[in-house]
Amino acid sequence: MGRRNRRATRHGESSKSALIDCHIPEEHFLQSTDPKEKTKNAGGAVEHTPLMKQFFAAKSDYPDLLLFFRMGDFYELFYDDARKAARLLDITLTQRGSSGGAPIPMAGVPVHAYEGYLARLVALGESVAICEQIGDPALAKGLVERKVVRIVTPGTVTDEALLDERRDTLLMAISRSKQGYGLAWADLAGGRFLVNEVDSADALEAEIARLEPAELLVPDEDNWPEFLRGRIGVRRRPPWLFDADSGRRQLLAFFKLHDLSGFGIDDKPCATAAAGALLGYVEETQKQRLPHLTSIAMEVASEAISMNAATRRHLELDTRVDGDTRNTLLGVLDSTVTPMGGRLLRRWLHRPLRLRDVLVQRHHAVGTLIDAAADADLREAFRALGDLERILTRVALRSARPRDFSTLRDGLALLPKVRAILAPLDSPRLQALHAELGEHDATAHLLISAVAETPPLKLSDGGVIATGYDADLDELRRLSTNADQFLIDLEQRERASSGIATLKVGYNRVHGYYIEISKGQAEKAPLHYSRRQTLTNAERYITEELKSFEDKVLSARERSLSREKLLYEGLLDALGTELEGLKRCAGALSELDVLAGFAERAQALDWSQPELDSAPCLRIERGRHPVVEAVREQPFEPNDLDLHSDRRMLVITGPNMGGKSTYMRQNALIVLLAHIGSYVPASRAVIGPIDRILTRIGAGDDLARGQSTFMVEMAETSYILHHATPQSLVLMDEIGRGTSTYDGLALADAVARHLAQTNRCYTLFATHYFELTALADASHAGGASGIANVHLDAVEHGERLVFMHAVKDGPANRSFGLQVAALAGLPKAAVTQARRRLAELEQRGGESHSAQMAPTALDAPQQFGLFTAPSSAAQEALQALDPDELTPKQALEALYRLKALL
């Protein structure tokens, strides 16, 4: 009993309350048996106590989940569950009784605070089965009946307390075939269900990086890509659950349809298989209907700008490379007022669109809000809006709480004001959103008349339904209300008749109404008082009059709560019929919140409306880095960018800390912002078609995959060379620095040539290899590769080094590496030694090395003399051929390839 006493004292509960409330005798804990630790009775059979039988029966259905086993005021965990929970939650691991001569490990959390513990477990990727007492302990003869009523997993949570209000919580399923992978994901808290198909593991990794699912379902098979192995939240399921035919049947049955053509997935078997597996898992864990999932949508990859996982990480969209979420693009951009608006903005940020018409409408809407000064009015109205999207989900799942109703009521009451703000605005998108808001006056009136102004947290507290809504409920409440005056009058009468001035009339939930007299006055108690309870310092009594009153009042209160629950269920039914329109309304309000936030940011930060051009170009005038500008105290130095068909690559040189990486990132972020519908931090931005943003910036060892810094660098570079197109924007920062000087220089040169000649993408190529600046001269000689030099400079002022942060045409003439080292605090002796060594190197071979590394044309690789007797590409291809293995057709194709290499 030591553990129970300690915990009960901490939570202010009786040490035996849980056992008494559950009618679980102490001996039910003793001699109980874990199946792994069997104890046999005299007949040789394994024997369990009633409590342990009940626990094992529930646990056997959910062997891989933590089981929260309700025992009165606590949820208990036993055996391995207890050990795991104690470690993850930092709660006490204790024991009670024994099993097979060994103690029974136990850990528990109080019911009134369990949501906090549950949230921590879910965040760690754990799933929990909630086993509740479904019988009334007061009526139970023996053990209280229990049943698993709910399963909480990282991807299926809908409770407000378990969710991040500004981030989607997604459940994803992945199937695979010879053609690639099928993905399905659902936001149960928001009512969204989507699918997609990708053709490679790289594309799959990019989608997972974009969506960041909390839970991932995959077939229990081998050879999954490495990035999935060991990932938190991955759950292996039987492979037969990922069958395309059964998935199709499951979707048809769920949506009550005859075909899936309306969803656009009839010819997507891999995505259909994933969707069926996901839907089956949701139905299995939620144990109820899911009326808020009304459709399934196919995401089309070509409609969005592609960004792989490395690009998202390098650009620090919502999380910095070090894991911090502050000082990110989202942190600067997010001016939304509502949680649902914040979630929509995050989705837009991670899926910038290529749909020019959609983006132009968004830009125009933002400009209209600014011109009409309507953004401030909208944002002020939205401050009282609440998270309608998730509230509607809880309404659909019939788990809405009283204050969800009042928040929904107050939100719907704002619609006339929002419509009035939008009505005069001349913007196609704003008028479309105005129409999507719909008319919900009847629903608003219902909630205004039915829900109390400030309802309690729980329905069981009573007082949720407004006075005047239901006559029967009002009558029952009058009985309870008049009870207070009756008790005051009774107390005064009894004090007068008994002569006991300290006599009190009170009530508690265990013993009901009572008359309390102190121990010192107890001998004066009238004869018609019947003792009800003895306390340390007082005696409590009951009289016939008080008993009669108690029966009447308690009956009225019970009937009042019962009536209120019935009316509450009626409200859920009524709202259920309006869900579709209300969901569209919530979606429109979310988008309006984002657009109004864009307008606020544009004005506060002096951003301008971008121009989306159909011609290939990327022209940015006086562009700034949105995050760096926001966090630094000094004015930000704006810079231009001009790329087009004849100028596709900039080789960027300059000192460390000069701003090369900032310059590259700011241009990528400006492009991204333009493609979500936002204004951009530039005086002007003209942006042609962009299909991908690919980056190779910075590096670090990937210890989990056993990859060095250089290996990570080469893997990311390889991805870019294989995927960049003439419409891609590529950022390359310091390629080759992770290996020896000559190897690094050779690789950097080869990568730059490949990007310029083969990929022909827009490229910002920052480097410390000054030899690469000769590529621009070779570009002019070759005529077609469009390479130019720009640099960022610094000036020495006495012993100080001042970085100018201005981008200028031409190559840098100094690196200032030693000056930067001195700024970093290297000992003066080390810097002096470095200066001497640099002078020796420059005198000994710097000039000849530079001459050797200066090719005159991009099509003359034989001039690049770093390696002994370099073979030509044609020679290498010819040596790789095996004539005996070639068919006539393959031989002819090989001949054409060889000719092209000459």
From Swiss-Prot:
Binding site for ATP: 654-661
SUPFAM superfamilies named among the record's database cross-references: DNA repair protein MutS, domain I, DNA repair protein MutS, domain II, DNA repair protein MutS, domain III, P-loop containing nucleoside triphosphate hydrolases
InterPro entries: DNA_mismatch_repair_MutS, DNA_mismatch_repair_MutS-lik_N, DNA_mismatch_repair_MutS/MSH, DNA_mismatch_repair_MutS_C, DNA_mismatch_repair_MutS_clamp, DNA_mismatch_repair_MutS_core, DNA_mismatch_repair_MutS_N, DNA_mismatch_repair_MutS_sf
Sorted UniProt keywords: ATP-binding, DNA damage, DNA repair, DNA-binding, Nucleotide-binding
Transmembrane found in the keyword field: no
Biological process annotations from GO: mismatch repair
GO CC terms in record: cytosol
Superkingdom field: Bacteria
Function: This protein is involved in the repair of mismatches in DNA. It is possible that it carries out the mismatch recognition step. This protein has a weak ATPase activity.
Protein family: Belongs to the DNA mismatch repair MutS family.
The protein's name: DNA mismatch repair protein MutS
Organism the protein comes from: Xanthomonas axonopodis pv. citri (strain 306)
